[in-house]
């Protein structure tokens, strides 16, 4: 079952401020990425970083967009 970025963060027992600190961005940026509008604009590279923090894979995360197979598989 796929989860939202927010659910993945909560499952990892992290606060938005924890993630912001690890990424070196303002808390508002993390809030935006967790919003429907923000998650639709997230880059694959940022998704990989967040998944690393959350202990999951991009396949575990529900996003309102689909990345092309070549971008996901690297080829």
Regions found by a protein language model. Name each.
Residues 1-12:
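A short, Lys/Arg-rich alpha-helix, primarily the initiator
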Residues 5, 19-20, 30-33, 61:
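Conserved hydrophobic/aromatic packing and binding residues within compact polymer-binding modules
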Residues 8, 40, 52, 60-75:
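Short, charged recognition helix plus adjacent turn
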Residues 11, 22, 53:
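Residues within the alpha-helical elements of helix-turn-helix
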Residues 24-40:
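Recognition helix of helix-turn-helix/homeodomain-like DNA-binding domains
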Residues 43-49:
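Short Lys/Arg-enriched helix C-cap and helix-to-coil transition segments
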């Amino acid at each position: 079952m796929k989860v939202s970025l927010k659910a993945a963060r909560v499952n990892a027992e992290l606060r938005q401020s924890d993630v912001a600190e690890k990424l070196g961005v303002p808390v508002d940026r993390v809030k935006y990425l967790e919003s429907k509008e923000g998650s639709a604009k997230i880059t694959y590279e940022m998704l990989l970083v967040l998944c690393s923090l959350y202990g999951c894979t991009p396949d575990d995360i529900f996003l309102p967009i689909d990345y092309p197979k070549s971008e996901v598989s690297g080829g």
